[in-house]
Amino acid sequence: IDEYTPSPYLTFSIHLDGNKERHDASVCLEGVFEKCISVIKLAIEKGFRVTINCTLFQNEPAEEVAEFMDMAMELGVEAVTISPGYHYERAPKQDVFLKKTESKQLFRDLFKLGIGKKWRFNQSSLYLDFLAGNQTYECTPWGNPTRNVFGWQKPCYLLVGEGYASTFAGLMEETE
């Protein structure tokens, strides 16, 4: 972390799928949650922007997710990117994904618990409304362009195996 300088253009997005037990089970390694928490605290202490990336799976009570959101806000992260775990064929475990009705109900229950709280999400209100089942959208390459070491991530990459484009122009032109 000492190799970087805080900037409004640099955000550390830390993967945390819920509370200690749930996250460590999700990544199949005990102790990862505590390491993530210490990294988050260190980065915030040094003045960096920090967000959390959280995926929700089956059998997660909204109350537990609400406690996680409270904890994330207490840590001082800028926001949480939250989404349901979408089913995809190559996943090593197939029985953990939320069905459409389960996903809608979980997010409706969660948002109800969040009324009056100061939870900060790293997504638009349109997307959050979609999670609660109040909107439908199609996948688009411009909806949430993401670039990582593999290239430009195509939308619905998990659902249809689209993968990545090597350039932004390729992402826009090749995505159907």
Give names to the regions the model predicted.
Residues 164-176:
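Short, solvent-exposed cationic patches
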Residues 6-141, 149-150, 154, 159, ...:
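Radical SAM enzyme [4Fe-4S]-AdoMet core and its adjacent flexible, acidic
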Residues 2-4:
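Short amphipathic alpha-helix with an adjacent loop that forms part of the alpha/beta core around
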